[in-house]
């Protein structure tokens, strides 16, 4: 909300639909006063807002869609994501939960997606390990995950972040019926094990929607 109010103040207009030139000038203004991760978050908020207006048919076309935004990305090791980028990705995903037009099914899948991303980066586990996680190996009360790696070697991971645990608990509550019919913890919309390919596609899709210009590939 603060990000949208700031955009409104900058444009000095009350109309919902701004010209692409106004948006372009606003983005340049953001680059002058904020760090890159803050600029990305504010742009993501604006993109989510106009996406909502399109879905509600309040506007026909999002004015921000064709506005090019370029960032000098942080240098990172292959297959890793800098913290600032991860923060922006999750910020965008959480902002989608606030949209008033979310259906029950959409909210359910969104909570699953956020739980997957939070777990991947809170634990650092491989995507294959996450997709194969059995429910019996997860203790959300203690925040402990038991991961079986190569050679059936077990390792224990502790999640100490309250936000991550709360998101996992919310996911578990919403998917209780499906979870009672399988051993796996992360499921697809049909109640089956969430596949590695689907998880990678999901992360890539949100990264593109949030205008992250990195090749986001959790290992």
Give names to the regions the model predicted:
Residues 1-219:
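Conserved catalytic core of the tyrosine transesterase superfamily
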């Amino acid at each position: 909300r603060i990000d949208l109010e700031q955009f409104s103040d900058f444009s000095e207009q009350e109309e919902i639909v701004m010209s692409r030139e106004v948006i372009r000038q606003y983005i340049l203004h953001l680059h002058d006063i904020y760090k890159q991760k803050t600029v990305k978050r504010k742009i993501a908020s604006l993109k989510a807002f106009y996406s909502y207006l399109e879905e509600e048919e309040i506007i026909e076309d999002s004015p921000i869609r064709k506005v090019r935004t370029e960032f000098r990305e942080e240098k990172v090791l292959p297959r890793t994501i800098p913290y600032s980028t991860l923060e922006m990705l999750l910020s965008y995903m959480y902002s989608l939960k606030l949209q008033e037009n979310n259906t029950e099914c959409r909210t359910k899948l969104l909570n699953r997606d956020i739980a997957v991303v939070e777990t991947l980066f809170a634990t650092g586990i491989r995507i294959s390990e996450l997709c194969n996680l059995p429910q019996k190996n997860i203790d959300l009360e203690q925040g402990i995950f038991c991961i079986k790696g190569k050679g059936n070697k077990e390792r224990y991971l502790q999640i100490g972040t309250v936000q991550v645990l709360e998101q996992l608990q919310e996911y578990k509550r919403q998917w209780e019926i499906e979870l009672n019919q399988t051993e796996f913890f992360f499921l697809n919309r049909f109640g089956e094990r969430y596949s590695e390919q689907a998880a990678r596609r999901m992360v890539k899709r949100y990264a593109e929607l949030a205008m992250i210009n990195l090749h986001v590939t959790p290992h």
